[in-house]
Amino acid sequence: MNCLIAIALSVSFFLVGIVGPIQAQLQMNFYANSCPNAEKIVQDFVSNHVSNAPSLAAALIRMHFHDCFVRGCDGSVLINSTSGNAERDATPNLTVRGFGFIDAIKSVLEAQCPGIVSCADIIALASRDAVVFTGGPNWSVPTGRRDGRISNAAEALANIPPPTSNITNLQTLFANQGLDLKDLVLLSGAHTIGVSHCSSFTNRLYNFTGRGGQDPALDSEYAANLKSRKCPSLNDNKTIVEMDPGSRKTFDLSYYQLVLKRRGLFQSDSALTTNPTTLSNINRILTGSVGSFFSEFAKSMEKMGRINVKTGSAGVVRRQCSVANS
């Protein structure tokens, strides 16, 4: 009898161990009872502003990406630091935009449901909604993320793929987050609505080898155009260039066509053609429909949105997205 009781207790504790994490997972409509209008508030706010800010979708999806790649999707990219060592102070995040936009959404939500909706969930929802309102793909965003307490510039520098990445570096950094080469190609497709400062790629135009010279992987005609019309010097850090010229406002397949023509703006774009798996994925996407691409892109976004999420007591809900709870 004692043996049976011991076994029963063991099973009971085992089940508690299983049920706990399951209950802590993300779920659709997480705020249905605690803040029923949360997702509509985010959606309406995005809808009211995206028409006046066509680059908003690209800015928010980039913020979501940069947030998830450092300590998971926990809103830590939003935290300000008086000492200048938070994630947003790291070089990859100096050109990230949308912080004020997320703060504004948070203020509306706090007025409706104080201390309920996390900043991490706001980023995930707003980035999806902004892309949808520009005619891009839709994807499921389960909620229940908690916000992180730590934001470290060095970690951002170590984990966010720079635009100078080769395929080996990209594969490693994506694998570190549980993403594969297919995800890399699909998520890179967001560059179709992206923009970049000249400083992110002028080394390809003026000093690729460190002793001057141009990146041979970049189409020479395209490079000449960039030099003469967009980025006249190596040190231009103000001019903004479309990553998918002429099609930036349309979420489509043209980015991949440019990559195959050696007209991807970043080295990391060109790198996608240097690996048989990534190249095969590009060709497969281009022979398929836009609808198929949207469906696959959605799956990779859903996968990215679950990276190392904090739920339950593992995180907090910040009252101000830019300030870590004391």
UniProtKB/Swiss-Prot annotation:
It catalyses: 2 a phenolic donor + H2O2 = 2 a phenolic radical donor + 2 H2O. Residues 1-24 form the signal peptide. The lineage of its organism: Eukaryota, Viridiplantae, Streptophyta, Embryophyta, Tracheophyta. There are 73 peroxidase genes in A.thaliana. InterPro entries: Haem_peroxidase (IPR002016), Haem_peroxidase_sf (IPR010255), Peroxidase_pln (IPR000823), Peroxidases_AS (IPR019794), Peroxidases_heam-ligand_BS (IPR019793), Secretory_peroxidase (IPR033905). Substrate binds at residue 161. GO terms for molecular function: heme binding; lactoperoxidase activity; metal ion binding; peroxidase activity. Its EC number is 1.11.1.7. Induction: Up-regulated by cold temperatures and down-regulated by light. In response to low temperatures, transcripts accumulate in the whole etiolated seedlings but only in roots of light-grown seedlings. The active site is at residue 66. GO terms for biological process: hydrogen peroxide catabolic process; hyperosmotic salinity response; response to cold; response to desiccation; response to oxidative stress. The gene is PER3. SUPFAM superfamilies: Heme-dependent peroxidases (SSF48113). This is Peroxidase 3.
